[in-house]
Amino acid sequence: MAKLAFENDEVPVGAVVVNNGEIIGRGFNQVIEKNSISSHAEINAINQASQFIKNYRLKNCDIYVTLEPCHMCAKAIVDARLSHLYYGAKEPKTGAIESIDKFLDREDINHHVVFSGGHMKDESSELLKKFFKSKRAKKASQKNLF
């Protein structure tokens, strides 16, 4: 899923929602394509899974994401009542699970999600580095045109 985002010139983050070993929702970043700040991979995967089971509550489902979720996505994961979150690379600037905040550890949230990070982190990090390196190179070449 992250590779699809990369191919579409979006930040390469992908997510899947799984129920009993079956993928019921897939998503990748489509913020630019959809002109929507909420079209993050996690939310797109959650929306697809909710449509699939015809319920916004995804009890007994897990979500796998290539990058540590932001606050918006962490809240969506809680509200969807997902059981487990597995993510790849840490996000030092906006990661709300372990990096800049520990949102899922809060006592006052209405549902607690078990989480684990570092899954396939090298692959996730490499794709992100490649994406941002190409963005910087493109920006530098555009500066040289003027």
Regions found by a protein language model. Give the residues of each.
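Zinc-dependent deaminase
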Residues: 1-8, 56, 69-146
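Small-residue (primarily alanine) positions within well-ordered alpha-helices
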Residues: 2-5, 15, 25, 41, ...
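Short, basic and Ser/Thr-rich N-terminal targeting/leader segments
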Residues: 9-13, 59
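Short beta-strand scaffold segments in enzyme catalytic cores
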Residues: 13-21
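Short beta->alpha transition motifs characteristic of CBS
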Residues: 24-31
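Conserved Nudix-box catalytic region and its N-terminal flanking loop in Nudix hydrolases
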Residues: 33-36
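Helix-adjacent hinge/juxtasegments
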Residues: 38-39, 43, 47-80, 84
